[in-house]
Amino acid sequence: MISSITSTVKHIVASALLLAALGSCTTVLVRTTGAEGITEDPTARTAGAVVEDQSIETKVVVNLKKLEPELKKANIKVISHNGVVLLVGQVASDGLKARATQITSDSSTKIKRIHNELEVAGKTSLLARSNDNWVATKVRTLMLANSSVPSGQIRVITENGAVFLMGLVTQANADGAADLARNVSGVTRVVKVFEYLN
């Protein structure tokens, strides 16, 4: 019975990985039709990059809590995009903020850069977190409605009123996204954590 369940789980996992890989292939094939020949979208993350980012996030979260017990009391979000790691939230001291950077750096050799935007402050309230979700939704909606901003390539993270923008974009796209976010009510500041194509 257990081996049957294990076998079924293995098949489900293999099928999910195959579908993810085929999804990436479909993107490539769609981009190869027409008279232009084969081109790549330099802004698109591969399925492997997405999995690697998830792995980085998991390793960092686990290590922060296991290697520094004081960080269990902190409010820390870890976001990885194409190997660029963003730390946001609140910690009790500058020492814990520095320790979070060190633990993050030691968690994976796949990390390209770390942006530590942790605040030395008490945890945000439930109301503040709800407001952050609302602000992020408004920013994403504005980006979707604006054809000059590649919303599918930009991640929006909001923490305590600050909006962090991540992705692999051109300087013009980054500036356009930041300008949109800046004009949303409830935004206290906008931080660009982009990788640039040009």
Task: Annotate each predicted stretch with a short phrase.
Residues 2-17, 23-198:
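N-terminal targeting leaders
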